Each structure stands twice: as structure tokens, then as C-alpha cells.
Design a protein with these regions (language model features):
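C-terminal "closing" transmembrane helix and its immediate cytosolic amphipathic cap
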Residues: 1-14, 171, 299, 303-306, ...
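Aromatic-enriched alpha-helical transmembrane segments of multi-pass intramembrane proteins
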Residues: 23, 32, 66, 129-155, ...
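Alpha-helical transmembrane segments and their membrane-interface exit regions
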Residues: 281-291
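Perimembrane loop-to-helix junctions flanking transmembrane segments
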Residues: 48-60, 210-212
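Membrane-interface junctions at the ends of membrane-embedded or membrane-associated helices
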Residues: 87-93, 170-177, 239-251, 291-308, ...
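N-terminal membrane topogenic signal
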Residues: 14-27, 178
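Alpha-helical transmembrane segments of multi-pass membrane proteins
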Residues: 33-45, 194-195
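Transmembrane alpha-helical segments and their boundary/interface "anchor" motifs
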Residues: 22-25, 29, 63, 67-70, ...
Length: 386
């Protein structure tokens, strides 16, 4: 298998091979985020199970799903964008296409949320930063979680996109035999950053649902510069695969490592469950799945159905909290028996998938087809050596 990977590394930096399994995995990550939010009894308060054991089991099952799902998206973003970076692309064209990819769905769900829940009561100090995708930079939970909560991660993505062309220049300069060292340094940097926040930022009073203060939660989870480690790790793992330095970890061990990381995250100090406990398994899984695609091996995530689900996963991610809030308001504090509650959770999940599909076919795909194609020029090449 190493020979297959090394053969692929002889290709130029613009790597035309698609990675359909990673598209399919995006849906799994979005489903984990849905399960996490649906299981909450506080903040969102959707968890509809009257039976305490069923409610607790639901919450424990998805207790790390939100943190892991978002971390997966950040690592995946760095990996995929590095993998597909074109040497004839321009910085402006790249950033324009990336903004075009995320902003229309953001605006649509922002407007829907404001119309349904907040137009009359949400002040401009909350809705305007959210609209402009700068709210994750503001250390107030009513701001960084305001309007449509999941949109905070788009602030991080936007920050990553702006930095990517410049990061790529330096990451491409790293000698092949030092890529693993830099990947390890990135993980150590993430751990050191979280440790410093844990030591230097007050931990009380706690937020409503978790044992962490607003300030510490903001810095350790929402603040875009401190999520850059995950994005850069994804970039480095892509370079490791492209240069033939991947260790050849198989899919089964990679998934086993991910499950172990998920369980491990349940027992580490709360703040370290956000990304420190799971970022290495996530990076290894993404690279292992990508390597399988390059080698032409089956993964179970590259089929037509999984790719369709992956295509709509961004829209699903953006609209699922709107669906959960609507159902929570309809429940109005009522709890249901286990069969009825399970049906309701599945119905909300189905509605989120449907909403994601509508966003994809009505907004995301038409916009990208109309304006999202690269317009390469022979100057200002992205990632060019300087």
C-alpha cells in the first residue's frame, strides 16, 4: 500500500483525485453534532425522554459528539483545502469561493432564525456580529451563541480561509522528513494552549450546562486563533499523505482509535474534551480514509447515498438547531415516553436532513455553480514559493 501512496505523491501539488469518502464522513460528523444538541437538557433543552435512564443514556451517548464533530470539521477543512489547492489559483479567487460556499447558507439560516425567534427581541449588538460572522471574536456568550448557534464555527472557518494561502507557503517548505515532527508540534501546541487557558483564566462561575466559566469556554472553544491548531494539523496530514509519508494505518484501527478517543474524552478534564482528547484520532481517521480513496479501496462512505448526505451536511448543520428549537417550543416542557421520544428525535433528525437538502438545492449548489468556479491567473499564485 505504501507504494500506491508514494506513486500518488509524484503528482504535482494540484491533486485532481477526489476523496468521496471524506464527503460521506462529513454527514457522520454533522449527525454527531445533531445528536449532541438533541441530547441536551439545559441550554437547548430538547431531550424529550421522560424516563430518567433513557434521557441520561441519550445524553451520555452523544456527550462528546458536538465537540468531536466540530473538531472533525476543522481538521477536515485544512486537509481537503490543502489537498485540492491549485497552484494557478489566486488568493482573492480562493477566498471569494470559500466565502461563497459558506455565507449564503449562513445568511438564509440567520434570516430564518431572526424571523422565527428573534427579530423583535434580539439587539443589534447580537444579530449584527452574527450576520457579519465576527461574533466568535466577542467574549460574551449571548453574542457568540446568539441567533443561530452553530454559525460561530463559520467565524473560525473564515479566519482559516484568510490565513490559508499564506500558511500553505510555509507548510510546503517543510522538508518531507519533518512533516510528522511539525504535526506532533501542532498537537503539543494545542495541549499547551488549553493548559495555559486552564491555568490562567478563571474557571468560575460556571455556565448553565457545563463546569466552565464563560471566559474560559470562549477562549478554549470559540476563539478562532485557538482553533487554528486543528486546521493546521489537517493541512499537515494532507501533506504527509501527498508526500508518501503516511504510516499506512488501516480503516479498522483508525476507527477503533476514534472510538477510544471518544471514550477517553468522557474522562479527561472538561476543557480538554473539546479537542485535545480527540484531535489525533480525528486526524488519523481522515488521513486513513483519504489514503483508502487514493488506493481505490472501499470504505463504505464513498457511495452515492453517503455522498448525497455529505453534500447536504453543511446545510443540515446550519439548520438543525432551528428545527430543534421549533420542536422544543412545541413541546413546551412536556416529556414523552421512550418510544414516542425516540420517534420525535428521529423526526427532528429527518427534518434537519430535509432542511439541509433544501438549502443545498435551493441556495448552496446554484450559487456555487453560478459564481464558484476558479478564475486562475498567471500572477499572485496561491501557495507559490516566495
Amino acid at each position: 500500500m505504501n507504494d500506491v501512496i508514494r506513486t500518488s505523491s509524484a503528482l504535482p501539488h494540484y491533486h485532481p483525485r477526489k476523496l468521496p469518502s471524506l464527503t460521506g464522513l462529513r454527514f457522520v460528523a454533522a449527525a454527531l453534532v445533531f445528536g449532541f444538541h438533541a441530547s441536551l437538557t439545559k441550554i437547548i433543552g430538547f431531550n424529550p425522554y421522560a424516563d430518567h435512564q433513557a434521557s441520561h443514556a441519550f445524553k451520555v451517548l452523544f456527550s462528546e459528539g458536538g465537540w468531536m464533530g466540530v473538531s472533525f470539521f476543522f481538521v477536515l477543512s485544512g486537509f481537503v483545502i490543502t489537498w485540492s489547492a491549485r497552484p494557478d489559483d489566486t488568493v482573492g479567487s480562493f477566498i471569494f469561493r470559500r466565502v461563497l460556499k459558506i455565507y449564503p447558507n449562513h445568511f438564509a439560516t440567520w434570516a430564518l432564525t431572526m424571523i422565527l425567534f428573534g427579530a423583535a427581541v434580539t439587539p443589534a449588538s447580537i444579530w449584527l456580529p452574527n450576520l457579519l460572522l465576527v461574533h466568535a471574536w466577542i467574549p460574551k456568550d449571548e453574542v457568540y451563541l446568539g441567533v443561530n448557534g452553530p454559525s460561530w464555527s463559520l467565524c473560525c472557518e473564515l479566519f482559516f480561509y484568510v490565513l490559508f494561502p499564506f500558511l500553505l507557503i510555509y507548510i510546503k517548505r517543510i522538508p518531507e522528513n519533518r512533516l510528522w515532527m511539525w504535526a506532533a508540534a501542532t498537537v503539543i501546541g494545542l495541549f499547551a494552549c488549553q493548559s495555559a487557558i486552564n491555568l490562567l483564566v478563571r474557571g468560575t462561575p460556571w455556565v448553565t450546562a457545563w463546569p466552565i466559566s464563560v471566559e474560559r469556554w470562549w477562549l478554549s472553544y470559540f476563539f478562532p486563533p485557538f482553533r487554528l491548531f486543528e486546521f493546521v494539523l489537517g493541512m499537515l496530514m494532507a501533506r504527509i499523505l501527498m508526500t508518501g509519508r503516511w504510516i499506512g494505518l488501516g480503516l479498522v484501527p483508525a476507527f477503533g482509535l476514534l472510538v477510544a478517543g471518544y471514550i477517553f474524552a468522557m474522562f479527561v478534564p472538561f476543557q480538554f474534551s473539546f479537542n485535545v482528547a480527540t484531535v489525533v484520532p480525528i486526524a488519523f481517521l481522515i488521513t486513513s480514509v483519504a489514503a483508502a480513496d487514493v488506493a481505490g479501496r472501499r470504505t463504505g462512505f464513498a457511495g452515492r447515498t453517503m455522498n448525497w448526505l455529505g453534500d447536504i451536511s453543511f446545510g443540515m448543520y446550519m439548520i438543525h438547531l432551528v428545527i430543534l428549537t421549533l420542536v422544543t417550543n412545541w413541546l413546551n416542557g412536556r416529556l414523552l415516553g421512550t418510544p414516542a421520544a425516540t420517534v420525535l428525535v428521529l423526526a427532528a433528525f429527518g427534518a434537519s436532513v430535509l432542511g439541509g437538502w433544501l438549502l443545498f438545492v435551493c441556495i448552496e449548489r446554484p450559487v456555487m455553480r453560478r459564481w464558484g468556479k476558479a478564475a486562475p491567473r498567471k500572477s499572485a499564485l496561491m501557495g507559490a514559493e516566495v
